[in-house]
Amino acid sequence: MKTSHNRANKQRKRNKIANKIFLLVLLFIFGFFGYKYINSRPAEYSQMIPQKYILRDFDELCNQIESSYMNLPQTKKYKDIDFLSLKPNFKSKIKLESGKKKDEMSTQEVFDLYNDILKKLYDSNVRIADKQTFNEILQQDNHNQILNNLSIKRYSNLAEEIPEKTFRAYSIDNYKDALYVKVSDFDSVNIQQDAQIFSNILKTNKKKNKIIIDFRDNDSDNLDYAINVIIKPLLKSDINVEFNVANKTQPIISKNILNRNGISFKTTENVSNIKINDNQKSIKYITIFNLVIKKSEEQKCDVYILQNKNTRNSADFVCQIANRTKFATTVGETTSGNGLNIVHTYKALPNTGLIVEYPLGQGLNEDGTTNEEVGTIPAIKLDDNSEIVKLLLSRIN
């Protein structure tokens, strides 16, 4: 009996120990998954953004760039910078800067910090969208696919950029039979007003038989301006032109800006009939854009566009359309490109609500080369210097 009693006591002790171990395991499991749940929940809005959310969204930002942004090879090749390999350095910078603010930062501070880091891509088209861009996204038909619940609250805390000028001041010079107009940028408070000013300049000088438009050092990104202010009044006849953009992922494209500028598009997974380089192995989709523009003036002059290595974005777009349709003759140096990929993609980050903006694809030149890498080659090659107008006139007169 005594032995049986001892066995029972030992069994009870073993059961108690087993129960304690079981409870400890349960507590560990609940604690572990509870911690994971708490730390994986989307952030709730607060005026200040905790460091953990800033770091988490920076990871997401890098993931988007790695999966969808196509110009990383160019950055590595021409700037000798491997952006993604620098990610630990960037995260250390985030920890350092947020540590100065008690491990939390304001919306404006995170906005500035992310954009400062993104400068290392050497592409002004990759950025955290500003408040003006956010307001434009709100008007897009696909804004629900872009924004999250935090975005509207977060962007209410961002400062609105005040335009530095309220009207367009073109630099004009007159030669014997040529009008010269310098267009240094496409920044505009009122595109309709600028279009009227530019049109009046052309009408006032309609006795000239040559128009020289200077886009050197113009890197503006404003498709509305490029089409409505510059191209339309310079056309001698209507134009209808196609151009292609290559993508790694299925593009989400808002029709708003395209429809109002006479641009239609279709995206296809069949790239067999598209001229592309052998090194473009990551291309999965091609978006074919079709641009139709009706002439707005009775233009009879020959048009020449000056370009250099600093001409890019929407100014490069005008140069590309000029080369393809011959509405103007391009003159100068090869541009820096970025003109054909007219659509940016936007995605709100899950924990801060800030919006990442970047070109989703790469424009393809007519020979299949990448516009972002090769640029736009001028029809007439001339060195970029102060005598370029005189050199051009001596050649074409």
Question: What annotation goes with each model-predicted range?
Answer:
Residues 113, 384-392:
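Short, hydrophobic-biased amphipathic alpha-helical segments
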Residues 36-39, 228-387:
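Conserved acidic, small-residue-rich alpha-beta core segments centered on
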Residues 2, 7, 15-260, 302, ...:
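Flexible, low-complexity junctional segments that flank or bridge functional domains
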Residues 378, 392-393:
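Juxtamembrane/interface motifs at transmembrane-helix termini
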Residues 12:
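Conserved active-site segments centered on acidic
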